[in-house]
Amino acid sequence: METKIITELTRDNLQLVAHALRHGDVVAIPTETVYGLGANGLDADAMDKIYAAKGRPSDNPLILHVPNAESIKPLVKEIPETAKVLIVAFWPGPLTITLPKSDLVPDRATGGLNRVALRCPDHAVCRNILELAGVPIAAPSANISGRPSPTTAQSVYDDMNGRIPYIVDAGICTIGVESTVVEVRDDGVTILRPGGITKEMLEQVVDNVSYDPFLSSQNEAPKAPGMKYKHYAPDAPMRAFIGNPKDVAEAFNNVIHEQDTKRGAFLVSQETYELLKDSVHGEFHVYGHSGDAVALAHDFYKTLHHFNECDVDYILAEGVENTGLGVAVMNRMEKACAGHIIYL
């Protein structure tokens, strides 16, 4: 199969993509979070093609993307008042809400669960495609399972060339990490996966917001997309350090000395880079100022893809505190590091 990257976002081209989606093909589409691998969310056979392209287990739930809030009504049994508040506050945007599914939604979309994950993206091109397709689009991240999520069309192509017919190129994703996934219950809102909408933002509009136990315990059964299996791993082994730039630079130097002749790659803040640049040789990416979770989120996956291309032996990263958007970034970084994070 030849994979075509669509860069001219004309109505005719978007119609072509929508037609392909509606009739069972898998297409990579842009969102504000990461690129998604889209298929008709009401067609179990089409969703099987997503799992085949990603090499992803079919018991992992998918998110159904819709162009507007009205579109979710046939997909759910009910919309609780708390969910309505969240929709008004954060849609379109990087918030996925799980609700009791209707019989219209195939079990294939939910991984066999009785709740469906729904999101309205804050991305004009994506919503145009959704409108034209006329069906909800199931779309996990458009990468081979276990690899870093893509925030550019080129990163999608590197993983999906020959596996899907089309990639819609709308430039780099503005947020850079996946959506927040929440479950709405009578007693409050549970964050199943941290993402672009923070706990603090949710608490501004609803009461009783908490994190799901699975985020800190691997013994709990996951209820959200992207939380069951290994994710986000670069090719080279990766370690991360969190602390002030001086301590991070010292920790980096100790590891670099241990690695001796091996080639390293370093994801760091501007302040840490200034402390290392004259003495350390390797592949650097500076994401922004120390503690800037927004900048790190934007650059994280893109940088991991770049480091994969550089054929390095190991990766060292400077993390941020687990507050605000930092919770989502560090969740992804911890997975990329296989848990090898040191707080200095």
Q: What kind of region is each of these model predictions?
A:
Residues 1-344:
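Active-site-adjacent structural elements in enzyme catalytic cores
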